[in-house]
Every structure is written in C-alpha cells, then in structure tokens.
From Swiss-Prot:
InterPro entries: DDIAS, NA-bd_OB-fold, Rep_factor-A_C
Cystine crosslinks: none
Gene3D superfamilies with a match to the protein in the record: Nucleic acid-binding proteins
Biased composition, class Polar residues, residue ranges: 817-834
Signal peptide: none
Tissues and organs where the protein is expressed, per its UniProt entry: Highly expressed in colorectal and lung cancer tissues.
Protein name: DNA damage-induced apoptosis suppressor protein
Localization per Swiss-Prot or TrEMBL: Cytoplasm; Nucleus
Source organism superkingdom: Eukaryota
Record organism: Homo sapiens
Length: 998
C-alpha cells in the first residue's frame, strides 16, 4: 500500500453499506472465506482457524466536494479512532451475549449499529486520503484534472478508495460509534422490560433513515420513556455535541411529539424554581456570591428588563398608597438625586406588621439593577440582585403575579443551559429550598422584634442632605440598640453598608475639599444651622457606642444635633417629627450625655490615631470646642516627644466634655487658637534643649582640660578660670578639632565636634519666616547632641598652656636660660606654614635680633582653618621627616666634623661649653647656605626634626640663645620636653623660596 495519495476535503452525505467489518487476511488484507472452523484466503492461499481470524474496517460513504459527488470507501485501521475500538474488538462486542441482550436478534443489532454510525459520520466533514485517482479514465497527474474528470459523465458519482481519514480540526472531539451504540442498547433494553418495543425517534437523533424495520419499531410516544430510561450521566453524554453535530434542548419546545402534560410540568417546575429564588432573595440572603446568581439565568434579558420596569411601576403605586396614610405616623425619607425612595409607613395591623421588612431603595440605573453591597459586581446579568434585601414579600408576590403571564412564553427557554448544566442547576435549587424555608421563619421573627422596638421609639429623624459641589457626603450614622446601620450616600458612588451585631460601624473617611478649621455649631428650636461640620473622629466616637442608645439618629452632610446645656434640656428636635410620635426630650438628652460621658476615652484614642488631624479644645470657652487640623508634625513626632507643646489631648478639658458635647456655638465664631504662639513655643523648647546640650559640652571640656593638666604636673600650671564664660559668648569662633590638631599629645581624649556658627546664628535668631501653611522651618531634628549650633571663645587655659611652653627650659640644668613670655601677633596660620620652607636663605636680623627666644604658637581666631578628619603636619605635607638635633648635625657630614652619635645628644643638651656649640652651629649654617642651591631634601637624609614620638611641629620664628645677635640664618631647634608634655619646634617667618625644591 505504498501508492501515492491525494487528499480530498468532503462532507459525508449518507452511508452506502450496512456491513462495516469483514474478515481479512493478515498477509494481503483480502477477504477470507470462513468454512466451518477454518479460514482460507483466495488471493494468497493462506489458511487458518476461523476463531483466530482478524477483522478489518470497510466504510463506504457518499460525499460531496463543492458541486461534485463521490463514493469513497475507507479501509483499514484509520477508522479505529472514530469507532472507538478495533474491528476485531467490535466483532467480539457484537457477539458477546453479556453485551448484547438475548432479546435482540442479529438484524436488530446491526440496525442499531448502523444508526450509531450514521449519527457519528453523517453531516461531518473529513479529509480523505485517496489512492486510486490514477485509475480514473482520462486522469492525468494533476489533481485538478482528476477532480474535473470525476465531475464529468452527467455528474455521476465516482468510486474512490481511501486509506486515510482525518478531521479538518484535530482539536474537535466527539462521541464515538460505540458510545452511541451503547446508548441505543440501553434504551432498547428498557422498552423490553416495559413490554414495549420502542426506541428513540428519528427527530431526537437528528437522523433520516428509511429502514422499514426501524420505522416499525419507533413510535411518536417514545420521548418520555427515553427521558426516564437515561440516567443523568448517559443523558449528558448523549446530548453533548459530537464533532460538528449539535443538538439543542430548546428544540423540545418546537416538537409536536412533546406532550402538553409534560410541557405544563416543565413550566411548573420552572415557575417553582423562580419562586424559590424570589423567596431566597426575600429572606435577605447575605451572600452576594450565591451559586444561584452565578449560574445560568432562568429569565431572558428582555424578560428581566420588562420585569424591572413593571416592578418600578408597582413600587411607585405602592408608595403612593403608603404615603397616603403616613400622616399619623412617623416616616423615614431619604432624598437624593441618585435615589428614588419608597416611604414605608409603620403598619397598624399585626398582619401588615409581618409583611414589613425594610425600606425599598432602588437605584436609578440604566441596567435597572438593585445593588446588594458595594462590592457586588456590576456586570451580573440578573436584574433582581438581592431585591428582597430591600423589598417586603408582598411586593415580591405582586411582581411575581405580574410576570407570571410571561412564564408560558417559549422565549424563556432561549437562555437555558444545555441539559447537563440544567440538571446541576436544578439540583442546586433543590438543595437551597430547605435552607430558604427555615430562613424565612427566622427572618420574620426578627422583623417582628424590630417593629416592636420601632413602635416603642415613636420618633424618627427625616433629614434631607444638602448637596455641596466638590464635597462628598458625610457618612450618615444610625445608632440602635440591636444593630448599627451605617448608610453612606456619595454623589458619585451610591452604596449601602450593613453592620450588624455588636460590631462597630465602618465609617468611611472622606476627604474634605479644604483644610480649614472645622467646628460644630448647633442651634435648637428648629433654627438655622451653621455650615461647620463635625469631624470624622467625633462621628466615629459616637457610632462606636451605639449599643447604649435605642434612638435612631441619622446624620447627613450638615450635622443636625440639638444642643444640650446644663441649663437647657431641650430634646433632639426634628422639624418633620409628628406630634403623636415624640418621646421625652429629657430622656433622649440624658442618653446622649451618658453615651458621650462613657465614650470620651474612645474620642481620645481615635484622635491619637489620626495621622494629621488633632483636636484642640479651647480653655476659655466653656460651651464650645474647636476642631483644628495640624499639618506640620506627623504622628511619630507626637509620640516621640510627648512633652512638646503641640496640640495634644492633655490640653482638652475633659471635665466639661461630658456635658458639652452637643453644646451650642455661635455661628460666626471660629475659636481662639493661636497657631503662631504654638509654633514659637516649639522653638523655645528646642532652645532649652540646646542649652542643656551646651552644658554637657562644657562638662566634657572641663574634664578634658583637667586630664591635660594632670598630664603635666611638673612643667605646667594650667589656669581654668572663667571657663564657663568662654562657652556662653558665641561671638568668637574656635574649632576644638583644630586645637587638638597641633597642640595636644596623643594621650588626650577626643572632643565632640560642633557645628559652624552660621547654623547656630540661624537657629538662635528669632527672625522666624513661616511657610505658606505656618509650619516651622526647623524641627527638633536639627538640634543634635553631637553637634550643637554654638561657637565658643578660645578658652583662657589654652593661652596659659602656650605660656607654659615658654617657661620650659632648653637646658634643664641651666636656670639662667629661660624663655620669655612675649607672644607677637604676626604669627603664620597653618595655611602659611604649608607653603613655608624649613630652611630659608634670606636673613632677617632686624626682625629677630630683639627676640631672645622662641615665641609661643598663637593664631588669630578669624583665620583659623576648619578641622579636618586627618591630622597632617606641615613637615609631613612637604615630605620632610623629623629627626633630632644630633641627627640633624650628622646628616650633612661636614668635612671637619665627626658624626655625632645618638648617645651624645644628652651631652650636647647638658654641656656648658657654649663657644664650641656656637662654632659648630656656625659651620653648619655656612654649609647650608653654600649648598642650598644644589642640595635636595628627602625624607631619609635631609630631615630636620626628630622622629621622636613626643615631638610635633609648631610654626614660630626662633633664634637659639647661644647664637647671639649676629646670626643671619634660621635654625631648627629640638625642645627637650618630657614625653607627656606637648613639645613645640618653631620655624621662622620668611618668604617662600622655590629654589629649595629645584
């Protein structure tokens, strides 16, 4: 079978044979002859046992391709997929007595199998792989010519052979032949048990078979028996579309064989289901995601729309009837442009009391939908969502009566699901009936209790909200003993909250159009109200204690609360309150007062939790309070600094809040809150904290100076006088970091870092420049412990420290040579020291001759360099290295001078031969002047200062006392201070010479 194939897409019109399998040879696939127990192949001569014979499919179909007809015979195992089993398996299935009843003969079984094959193939399109197209007369190799030749000869159907059959769309799946055959067998067996030979009619199978035997079996009364015989699973499998064959349940309504009694029974079931849905809705089922509403709708869209319109008309008529008798009883009226209300009166009779459930509120939407909760989906197809949550059962019965005339309309069946979905849907409805009936009785009992309490109250508030452009409505609050009902009406989104039980209502916080001061202004005796609004925290506090109050108070955009003073015990007045419905005014006021007295702590908690809205109660007004909105400090700052003078709740006079929650307030009064004083009070607090930090810094410096004095017990005598005065005056500037840079030894403890005086002057000044919302520019975060904005004068003990440097002797054993305390003002700053050379060739005898000794290091405070993170000495920046005086003399290797060992340095310091030392120094200086243009200084051989850890660099011009006034050069000296003392090595003041680095 290796022939070439051509593919043909065609639709099956009819079957051409009734035998679909044949015994075939395993070698040549030809038909074999079965003789008794043996089989013989006439083509190839192979033989075998008849019991082991293989069977092969052979299906002959009449197909059409556009305007051409063909008879295609399909062979082979390619049909196994469509039959559901192999040809050999199908043969064994038919011959099995356990599968096929004994009452069915072979002919009947074959007829049922033929029906099953027709159901599976007829009307479907397939792609056939044709193999014998070359044997057609006049056929060429071109496929188009082949199709053209086949359509010749007066449109005669040409016989073709196909070895392949596939579906055009592999994704399409349908029932197989064996499935349909199994369904037909079950139906036929049921009729045999009922002693009636009946089978499904041709219409139900969508077939048109002309077999006389089948026609004699089938009757028109077989529909009901067929429905009864099939189980739910088999029924759904039978009616599921097979391939492209579709059967819709709605065809049952057009069937003449469908009896009138069964139609009335079906419609009765539908009406009962609709009533059960209405009852479930009337009982106020709280679940908005009921599976009933998520399933297929039992009402078409047109039916829903017309039903909603009729319901609106009926509700309007009912409203007129009820409003006609409400004159002697109180009423609840909620008026808004987005709602049309139905005013419900309190029934006079007990029979009418049972039917009273709640007020009817229907949204005026284009979809005519009744919303349940605000989270309900808008796209829900049904127009009667949770209608019973608002409607009394009597109105629902009116609506059902009005729409009952449409129940017999066959158009209702258009929206029904398929049978398998309908069965599940009806099962869900049946399971809901028991729960619904139990729920109805409990709901009615609950309604009776509510109406009894409603009778006891005899008073209601009817408030018409005032529409304000740009501002949302304040959520109304209903306070009740049994439940708390919060109804929020927004101009854009209308929604309904139901908070039941002891739960606190969820008051929606709405944004106000501005941040102005809010106040409560209420007048009594029905006079005009102020336009100030009660803040949301206060409303929350009132609603949180609703369990203690039985009166329903409805609050809208303009809060209308009757005043309550100690001298005035007027009630909550209502302009719409009827004369016969009033209760004692004193009782209501006492309840409100008790309510507010018990729950004032809740007000405090709510105000503390508000992020940027705090309450400030005026102390000079006994009958009023002002709501102030503070925008500057967040909640964190309020919690972290409880002592700050912000609008905390400790300033609220809770003593008279108990009696003045609803006190009257003058219309034009806006409170006496001074925001500027409050803001500057914060700055004063910050300055007090800054003063405390300054004192701490003074203590640190005192300890530091004491430790420094203790480190120089023999050479130093520090004076710590007037230390506190130095820190108070901020006029002079000093950086403690730079002081420790060159003055003090490494054993001293580090001092804290201070900010610059510019920042201090900004904070210390009283020139406060508020922003647009009167917020302070600097908060508490600018006052830091480690950096106070304050500059200090140079302490006196530092000058004393410099004086002690001069008192130290160069030669300890020689008491005659002491340093003079003169300190000139022309001392270089560290910036000048960096650029100054260590040795200068320019002599300045006229400047330094009158100085007997080195001068102390003192800098001008105005030229003081800010401190740095790293301490770098001028000698280190120039690349020089400090060496001792002995190494200084030995570094040059004078020809007439021997190297001075380090151990002889002590002898030089203590020697009394001044002339010898003077001569050596003169020779050294002469050599320096001679070689200054050629000698290059490096860190290893030409350093001047010793590497001793107790020596640091100081920039000051010095002349050795033993050199005399005739010296014309500059020298470097090593001062033999103690290890703990702060030594100093001075350098001369001279012009910078670039020749030293050439």
């Amino acid at each position: 079978m290796n022939r070439r194939r051509k593919f043909l897409l065609a639709s099956v019109l009819a079957l051409q044979n009734s035998s679909f399998i044949y015994p075939s040879c395993q070698k040549c696939f030809s038909r074999i002859i079965l003789v008794s127990k043996r089989s013989n192949c006439p083509k190839c001569g192979s033989t075998g046992e008849s019991g082991n014979a293989n069977y092969r499919y052979k299906l002959s179909l009449k197909v059409a391709e556009s305007n051409k007809l063909f008879v295609i015979t399909v062979f082979g195992s390619c049909l196994d997929t469509f039959f559901g089993l192999t040809a050999t398996g199908l043969h064994r299935y038919i011959q099995d007595p356990n599968k096929i009843p004994e009452t069915l003969d072979n002919d009947t079984t074959q007829n049922l199998l033929t029906k099953a094959v027709e159901t599976c193939f007829v009307g479907q399109s397939f792609i056939f792989g044709v193999t014998n197209f070359e044997n057609q007369p006049g056929q060429g190799s071109d496929a188009s010519n082949f199709l053209q030749q086949c359509s010749d000869h007066k449109r005669k159907a040409k016989a073709l052979v196909a070895c392949q059959i596939v579906l055009p769309d592999p994704g399409i799946a349908g029932f197989t032949v064996i499935d349909y055959f199994h369904q037909l067998l079950q139906t036929f067996n049921f009729r045999k048990l009922q002693c009636d030979s009946q089978a499904p009619n041709n219409h139900l199978l969508a077939l048109d078979h002309s077999n006389s035997d089948l026609s004699s079996i089938y009757t028109s009364d077989s529909t009901s028996d067929f429905f009864k015989s099939c189980s739910k699973d088999t029924f759904s499998k039978f009616w599921q579309p097979s391939l492209e064959f579709t059967c819709i349940v709605s065809q049952l309504t057009d069937n003449d064989d469908f009896s009138a009694s069964e139609q009335s029974k079906a419609f009765g079931t539908l009406q009962q289901n609709r009533k059960s849905i209405s009852i479930a809705e009337a009982t106020g089922s709280s679940s908005c995601h009921d599976p009933i509403q998520d399933s297929w709708s039992l009402v078409s869209y047109m039916d829903k729309k017309s039903t909603a319109e009729k319901l609106g008309k009926e509700l309007g008529l009912q409203a007129k009837e009820l409003s006609a008798v409400h004159s002697s009883h109180h009423e609840i009226g909620v008026n808004d442009s987005n709602l049309f209300s139905l005013e419900m009166r309190e029934p006079l009779e007990s029979s009418n009391t049972k039917s009273f459930h709640s007020a009817v509120e229907i949204k005026n939407r284009s979809q005519h939908e009744l919303p349940c909760f605000q989270h309900h989906g808008i796209d829900t197809p049904t127009s009667l969502q949770k209608r019973s949550a608002c409607c009394p059962p009597s109105l629902l019965r009116l609506e059902e009566t009005a729409s009952s005339s449409q129940d017999g309309d066959p158009q209702i069946w258009d929206d029904l699901p398929f049978s398998e979905s309908l069965n599940k849907f009806l099962a869900v409805l049946e399971s809901e009936i028991a729960v619904t009936q139990a729920d109805v009785s409990s709901r009615k009992h609950h309604v009776d209790n509510d109406i009894d309490k409603f009778h006891a109250d005899h008073s209601r508030l009817s408030v018409t909200p005032q529409r304000t452009t740009g501002a949302l409505h304040t959520p109304p609050i209903a306070l009740r003993s049994s439940q708390v009902i919060v109804k929020a009406n927004c101009s854009k989104d209308d929604f309904l909250f139901n908070c039941k039980g002891n739960l606190s209502p969820s008051v929606e916080k709405e944004s106000q159009p501005d941040n102005k001061v809010e106040a409560v202004s209420v007048n009594h005796n029905g006079r005009d109200m102020s336009e100030y609004f009660l803040p949301n925290p206060y409303l929350s506090a009132l609603s949180s204690s609703s369990k203690d109050l039985e009166t329903i108070v409805t609050l809208k955009k303009t809060i209308r609360i009757s005043p309550h003073r100690e001298s005035d015990h007027s009630s909550l007045n209502n302009k719409y309150l009827n004369g016969c419905g009033e209760i004692s005014v004193s009782e209501m006021n006492e309840k409100l007062t008790t309510l507010c007295y018990r729950k004032y702590n809740d007000v405090s908690d709510l105000c503390k939790l508000e992020n940027k809205q705090y309450c400030r109660w005026s102390k000079n007004q006994d009958d009023s309070f002002t709501i102030c909105r503070k925008l500057t400090y967040p909640l964190e700052t309020l919690c972290n600094s409880p002592n700050r003078s912000t609008n905390t709740l400790k300033e609220m006079p809770w003593g008279h809040i108990n009696n003045n929650v609803t006190q009257s307030y003058s219309i034009g009064y806006e409170g006496s809150y001074d925001a500027s004083a409050d803001l500057f009070d914060d700055i004063a607090k910050e300055m007090d904290i800054a003063t405390e930090i300054t004192k701490k810094s003074q203590d640190i410096l005192l300890k530091w100076g004491t430790s420094l004095a203790e480190s120089h017990p023999s050479e130093s005598d520090f004076s710590l006088r007037s230390l506190s005065e130095d820190f108070i005056q901020p006029s002079q500037k000093l950086s403690l970091q730079s002081l420790s840079d060159s003055r003090h030894s490494r054993t001293c403890s580090p001092t804290p870092h201070f900010q610059s005086d510019s920042e201090y002057n900004f904070e210390n000044s009283q020139d406060f420049v508020p922003c647009s919302q009167s917020t302070p520019i600097s908060g508490f975060h600018q006052t830091r412990i480690h950096g106070i904005n304050r500059a200090f004068k140079k302490p006196v003990f530092y000058s004393d420290l410099d004086g002690n440097y001069e008192k130290i002797r160069i030669f300890p054993e020689n008491d005659k040579q002491q340093a003079s305390p003169s300190c000139p003002k022309n001392i270089k700053t560290p910036s000048q020291k960096i650029r100054s050379p260590i040795v200068s060739g320019v002599s300045q005898p006229d400047v330094f001759n009158h100085y007997p000794f080195a001068e102390c290091h003192e800098t001008d405070s105005d030229e003081w360099v800010p401190p740095t993170t790293q301490k770098i000495f001028p000698s280190d920046m120039l690349g020089f290295q400090g060496i001792g005086l002995g190494k200084c003399l030995a570094a040059y290797h004078f020809p007439d001078q021997q190297e001075l060992p380090r151990k002889k340095l002590k002898h030089i310091r203590q020697g009394t031969n001044k002339g010898l030392i003077k001569k050596k120094l003169k020779n050294m200086l002469a050599a320096v002047v001679t070689k200054k243009k050629t000698h290059k200084y490096n860190c290893k051989s030409s350093g001047w200062i010793s590497k001793c850890p107790d020596i640091q660099v100081l920039a000051a011009p010095q002349l050795h006392p033993i050199l005399g006034p005739d010296s014309c050069s500059e020298v470097k000296c090593c001062l033999p201070f103690s290890e703990k003392g702060p030594p100093s090595v001075c350098e001369t003041r001279s012009a910078w010479s670039p020749e030293l680095f050439s």
